[in-house]
Every structure is written in C-alpha cells, then in structure tokens.
C-alpha cells in the first residue's frame, strides 16, 4: 500500500501565502488524514476515492499532527501572478504490511501552470539519464536526491507532454484523467514497507516538479 501527499511549496518570490500560511514549514491540513503520524482513520470506505486506505504513523521526522521536517508545504499555494513559479512535491510512503511491488507513479500537471523542463538541471543527475538532457523532475529515493530527465532514456522518470497518454507506454498506470496539460511519471519499482517512522529509508521519498503560472 502506498500513501501519498501532494503539497505546494510556494511561489518563486515568497513562501508565505496571502492567508499567512508558511509553505516552507509543516502545515497540518485538518481534512487530510494522511499528512501526519496520528492514527485517526483506520476503517476506510473502499468507495472513498480521496481516502481509500488506512491512516499511517510511519512518516519520517514527523511528530503526531504537530510538527514535521519532512512533510513541508501546503495544499493552498495562495494568490500568485502569471509568470511566477510554483513547486509541487508529492511525498510517498510504503505504508502497508507488505512490500509494495512494481510501483508506477503518475501525476498530472495542474491546468493553471506550465511544466518547467529545466528546473533541476543543476541537481545531481540520476543514473542512466541522457547527458545534456533537461531535468525537470527531482526524486528523493533511498535517502538520496537525484535530478531526472524528462525524456525516455535510462533513468526512471519521464515527462509526457499534453495529449500523450502515459498508458501508451505503461498500460497499467493510473493518472486519474486524460493528459490535457502534461504528466510526470516515475517508475519507483519495489518499495519495502515502513516498519517504523523513517525505517527503512527505502520505504519513503518524494517527487518534485515546478510549474509556471499561466
């Protein structure tokens, strides 16, 4: 079982929203069961697509629902202007009782932004990435960050431009809708289940990309 939390981490020039939220810190969202280590949702409704699985208390560096140095950001990015950049981070955790096998991640780029292809060109390249290719996807996996390319090459990520469905390459992938504005795909492979918060470090990580406000 994979638990995921998607958060925005602020505009290009500020990390504080117009409502006063600090997107450079931890924000507990009362309507999100999964963004803390408090077990308050243990009998999920299988028909609830927003909260389909049990809650977890295995996020790293997270204390209850009061603090976290891992789950940084919020779901409300505040008021932004065209041309500004937003950074999106999807935190993942293998939170089940068994290893999660053949994990394929897909996230559609929000309709209000345009994917920035070279956001992480200065990051540490991932293994197998094409030399000289733009790197617009950042991955934390197995305790290390790696900047991944947008193209089909030897690394484990790919950006699909609008109109090209990831399912044409990965028939079983689920992106929750048509690819109308771009989609980010990462092949995470097998993820061992977390046995304690942050243990093992191969059980959790994050995927990050940036978009420019239209």
Positions of PLM-derived features:
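Exported/extracytosolic protein signature
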Residues: 1-214
């Amino acid at each position: 079982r994979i638990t995921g939390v998607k958060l925005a981490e602020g505009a290009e020039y500020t990390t504080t929203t117009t409502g006063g939220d600090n997107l450079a810190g931890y924000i507990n969202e009362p309507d999100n069961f999964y963004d803390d280590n408090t077990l308050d949702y243990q009998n999920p409704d299988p028909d609830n697509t927003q909260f389909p699985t049990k809650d977890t208390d295995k996020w790293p560096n997270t204390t209850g629902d009061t603090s976290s140095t891992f789950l940084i950001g919020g779901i409300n990015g505040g008021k932004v202007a065209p041309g500004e950049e937003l950074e999106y981070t999807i935190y993942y955790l293998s939170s089940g009782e068994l290893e999660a096998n053949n994990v394929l991640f897909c996230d559609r780029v929000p309709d209000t932004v345009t994917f920035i292809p070279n956001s992480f060109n200065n990051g540490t390249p991932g293994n197998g990435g094409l030399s000289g290719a733009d790197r617009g996807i950042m991955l934390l996996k197995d305790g290390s960050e790696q900047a991944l390319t947008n193209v089909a090459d030897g690394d484990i990520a790919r950006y699909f431009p609008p109109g090209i469905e990831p399912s044409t390459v990965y028939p079983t992938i689920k992106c929750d809708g048509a690819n109308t504005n771009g989609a980010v795909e990462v092949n995470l492979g097998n993820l061992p289940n977390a046995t304690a918060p942050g243990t093992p470090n191969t059980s959790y990580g994050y995927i990050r990309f940036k978009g420019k406000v239209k």
